[in-house]
From Swiss-Prot:
This is Elongation factor Tu. The keyword Magnesium applies. The keyword Cytoplasm applies. GTP binds at residues 19-26, 82-86, 137-140. Keywords: Cytoplasm, Elongation factor, GTP-binding, Hydrolase, Magnesium, Metal-binding, Nucleotide-binding, Protein biosynthesis. It catalyses: GTP + H2O = GDP + phosphate + H(+). The gene is tuf. Its EC number is 3.6.5.3.
Length: 396
């Protein structure tokens, strides 16, 4: 069978299902793929077992089970992630293994919000999932309209507690199982849900459209031409003649102009997100720039040394620590291309953090580095990874 060509005319978004265990995340994922496939013949109809038996993957040394499902609506192509276990969600969201432009929060109408409902909303807030659409599931099991309204209010309040616009979030009431079984009324609810996702979750800005940034991996001098910084462009575009800043690991940001862009020894007019390049920098000496800094469009990212983060600590089985750590723990924080020592401050009431836990923490780095909300990092001890995290807010 010939491979289907990827249709680029539709915009693309990454989404996922979140919510408490057994509230119907996987059933909903199966229902969406099945109902949409039935209508358009595109994508693949996935059964519950195919999604639930997701293979384990290794992402930054962490074992995560994730199911990847794709489907399309009339206007968009979606990549959808669903995780079998709660721990998989935590790891997935913190490591960014599955980037989400928006999430469908599944809440059982029969049970209402539960502890993991709250935890997944908090995680979404901390790791920067920008939009949430709610699916109240199992509505076929609740015949009291007032009860449904009560659960909806509870979910909206919970979202507002974590700075999501609880009053404006779309809430769709349905039954994933009934839709999967082919009940037309409940299939209609799946279309209603996907219309809400299409409309409420904006198309993400592509990496190439964002302001330029490239982590510096290596630096060398070319006699008679100047200093070259190499690395993979993380976002945006850069062309000859652009002014860039050199940020991190030093008191002052350096400013310079890109006088040449090379890829595979060929000169380019410009480079964009995903390209591995060498950038020739005007008037910069070999000592002015080092691995671990970033080149960026002036004024778009700033160096910081203190931030709050959401962190997952590797379990012993994943090659992590065998013992807990306490406040004032001083590991290395690996950002993009370099390690920086930092001091950990734990939240009030948290005495210690065990391997396999996830926690919020405050980190104080010994030197500044270019970071912003949503920047990912690893925590390392002597070169081995013991944790993974994401910056949730900047302090200074």
């Amino acid at each position: 069978m010939a491979k289907e060509k990827f249709d680029r005319s539709k915009s693309h978004a990454n989404i996922g299902t979140i919510g408490h265990v057994d509230h119907g995340k996987t059933t909903l994922t199966a229902a969406i793929s099945t109902v949409l496939h039935k209508k358009s013949g595109k994508g693949t109809a996935m059964a519950y077992d195919q999604i639930d038996g997701a293979p384990e993957e290794r992402e930054r040394g962490i074992t995560i089970s994730t199911a990847h499902v794709e489907y399309e609506t009339e206007t968009r192509h979606y990549a959808h992630v669903d995780c079998p276990g709660h721990a998989d969600y935590v790891k997935n969201m913190i490591t960014g293994a599955a980037q989400m432009d928006g999430a469908i929060l599944v809440v059982s109408a029969a049970d209402g919000p539960m502890p993991q409902t709250r935890e997944h909303i908090l995680l979404s807030r901390n790791v920067g999932v920008p939009y949430i659409v709610v699916f109240l599931n199992k509505c076929d099991m609740v015949d009291d309209e007032e009860l449904l309204e009560l659960v909806e209010m509870e979910v909206r309040d919970l979202l507002s507690d974590y700075d999501f616009p609880g009053d404006d979030v779309p809430v769709i009431k349905g039954s994933a199982l009934k839709a999967l079984e082919g009940d037309a009324d409940y299939e209609a609810k799946i279309f209603e849900l996907m219309d809400a996702v299409d409309e409420y979750i904006p198309t993400p800005e592509r990496d190439t459209e964002k302001p330029f940034m490239m982590p510096v991996e290596d630096v060398f001098s070319i006699t008679g031409r100047g200093t070259v910084a190499t690395g993979r462009v993380e976002r945006g575009q850069v062309k000859v003649g652009d002014e860039v800043e050199i940020i991190g690991l030093q008191e002052e940001n350096g400013k310079t102009t890109v006088t040449g862009v090379e890829m595979f020894r060929k000169l380019l007019d410009y480079a964009e997100a995903g390209d591995n390049i060498g950038a020739l920098l005007r008037g910069v000496s070999r000592e002015d720039i080092q691995r671990g800094q970033v080149l960026a469009k002036p004024g778009t990212i700033t160096p910081h040394s203190r931030f709050k983060a959401e962190v997952y600590v590797l379990s012993k089985e994943e090659g992590g620590r065998h013992t807990p750590f306490f406040a004032n723990y001083r590991p290395q924080f690996y950002f993009r291309t370099t390690d920086v020592t930092g001091i950990v401050h734990l939240p009030e009431g948290t005495e210690m953090v065990m391997p396999g836990d996830n926690t919020e923490m405050e980190v104080e780095l010994i030197s500044t580095i270019a970071i912003e909300e949503g920047t990912r990092f690893s925590i390392r001890e002597g070169g081995r990874t013991v944790g993974s995290g994401v910056v949730s807010s900047i302090i200074k």
